């Protein structure tokens, strides 16, 4: 509407191309901004989204205060995917957590030991991860009206940018 008032008309394809070019740049800038600002207690979980009618796994982690740690989309749900996620999270945050809380996914204990080290305490409890499960709702509610994705690349781009922007704009309560 702002552009129409000024006499500028863009085809839908141009807007989609801008998104494809600018979304990764925005995502990387926000990831760099987050480095070193993450707590030492992580909550990790995975959920699934539809891509071309198939289920693809979205690994997500937040810290104790609800700040985003990392997001990774994987076609498989196993130890290799969990290790890739923890490597990515360690690279993004620049630190190793003291404690990781997860549900009962069997790939997490081995991946945590292999990537983060033996000294990281791993808690397995379905109910302690509840605020992360609730956090999945934000991305699921955004994806549901779209009916899934047509390509894995667009799903990766969307999931990463959506969570990064949502984390950057969310209201925070600081402890005094």
Give the predicted meaning of each segment.
Residues 1-176:
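Residue-level recognition of single "structural anchor" positions
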